Every structure is written in structure tokens, then in C-alpha cells.
Regions:
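Short amphipathic alpha-helices and their capping/turn segments at secondary-structure boundaries
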Residues: 2-13, 43, 100-115
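Alpha-helical substrate-recognition element adjacent to the catalytic core
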Residues: 10-90
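C-terminal cap/substrate-recognition subdomain and adjoining C-terminal extension
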Residues: 66, 72-125
Length: 125
């Protein structure tokens, strides 16, 4: 099986969208991605060249994470990672900061010039 997360080899500097799914791409009771909402995200990605980091609870469920990554890849949206969950309620901002810190440290250790220079979180919370 190929990796769902893509390398960042040709992206300098990086712009990232930390993406929630429920309430953003899935506003229904069926946990189904909505094409019109995916189209909005696709337009934003095309206009900015941003990559995606999944911060949604969908990252915790392998089948939902796979479904999301495949849907995004189908639209030429690159997923470069996912945040690590925290046990603390409402900790999503801290999870994002932890991802950025870890990502930058990893790139530095590998002597790679990749840094996320700009980012935003798209979340309904």
C-alpha cells in the first residue's frame, strides 16, 4: 500500500492548512464528505498552493483517515501529515503547535530547508 502522507520534497516554503473535517467538509449526520465543501477546499488550495495537515478526529480512525486522504489526493491536494492527539479537551491549538515544532525539528535534523512559513486552521470549534 502506498503512503497516504506525501513527502515535502518540492515544496519550499510551505503553507499549510490544518484541517478539521466534521463541520468543515462533512456537515451531515452520516460522516460523509460533501462534494461542494471539498470543492471549496480545492479552490483554496489551488489559490494558495497550501498543503494539508489533518487535525480532525478523522485522523484517529484508520478507515476515515484513508477515505479523507484518498478524496483529497483525487483533487490533487497534498496531505503531509496529521497532528498527534492529546488527552486534554480543547487541545487542538496545542496539537497544531506541537506538530509545527516537531516538523521543523525533523526537517532541521535531516538538513532539509522545509519550514511551514504560513499556516491556518480550518475548524468549526
Amino acid at each position: 500500500m502506498t503512503s497516504l502522507v506525501e513527502p515535502v520534497a518540492d515544496l519550499v516554503p510551505l503553507q499549510a492548512i490544518f484541517l478539521d473535517v466534521d463541520g468543515v467538509l462533512c456537515c451531515n449526520d452520516y460522516a460523509v464528505l460533501q462534494p461542494e465543501l471539498l470543492a471549496n477546499l480545492t479552490m483554496a488550495i489551488e489559490n494558495t498552493g497550501a498543503v494539508v495537515v489533518v487535525s480532525s478526529d478523522w485522523r484517529l480512525f484508520p478507515s476515515k483517515f484513508t477515505e479523507l486522504c484518498r478524496a483529497l489526493k483525487h483533487r490533487n491536494i497534498r496531505v503531509i501529515g496529521k497532528t498527534q492527539p492529546s488527552d486534554t479537551e480543547g487541545a487542538r491549538p496545542l496539537e497544531i503547535i506541537r506538530f509545527l515544532t516537531t516538523f521543523h525539528a525533523k526537517m532541521k535534523r535531516q538538513s532539509k530547508p522545509f519550514r511551514i512559513k504560513r499556516w491556518l486552521a480550518v475548524d468549526d470549534r
